[in-house]
Amino acid sequence: MTSTLITVVAAAIVEHGRLLVVSKKAAPGVFYLPGGKPEPGEDAQATLLRELDEELGVRPHGLTRLADFRGIAALEQAPMLMTVFAATLAGRPRPAAELARLAWTTGADGYRPLLAPAVRDQVIPHLRASGRLAWPG
C-alpha cells in the first residue's frame, strides 16, 4: 500500500430509491461512485462536470456538497480523500471511457453489486442518515 493521499471527487446520484454506482474496466467486479481525480488547477465541481461527461455522457445538475470521506481507495490501495456531491442528471447515463458497467443499488442488495468499502461503509450510511437514500423495505 502506498502512503500518497489520493484526492477524488464523486457524485451521489439517487433515483427511485437507488444509488448509481459504476465499475471500472481495471476492476469490473467492484462498484464505486462515478467521479474521478482533479486535474491541475481544477476545482471539485469542474472535476465532477468533466468526469461525468467523460464517464457517463451526462451533465449533473443541482450539485450540493455532502461530505468528505476518508478511507482506502479500493483499486489503488492508498489513502483517499473523497469529496461527494449530491446531484441529479440530465440525460441517461451510459458507461464510457474507463468504465465497464453501471448499476443502481439500494445498498442492501447483498453482494450484488460488490461495493467499494468507502461507498458501502461511509457514503451509503451518510445518505441514509441524511434522508437522501431510504432504507429498503
Model-derived features: positions:
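Actinobacteria-biased recognition of intrinsically disordered, low-complexity terminal regions
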Residues: 1-2, 135-137
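Structural detector for helix-capping/boundary residues
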Residues: 17, 36, 50-51, 105-108
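A conserved beta-turn-beta hairpin within the catalytic core of GNAT-like acetyltransferases
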Residues: 26-31
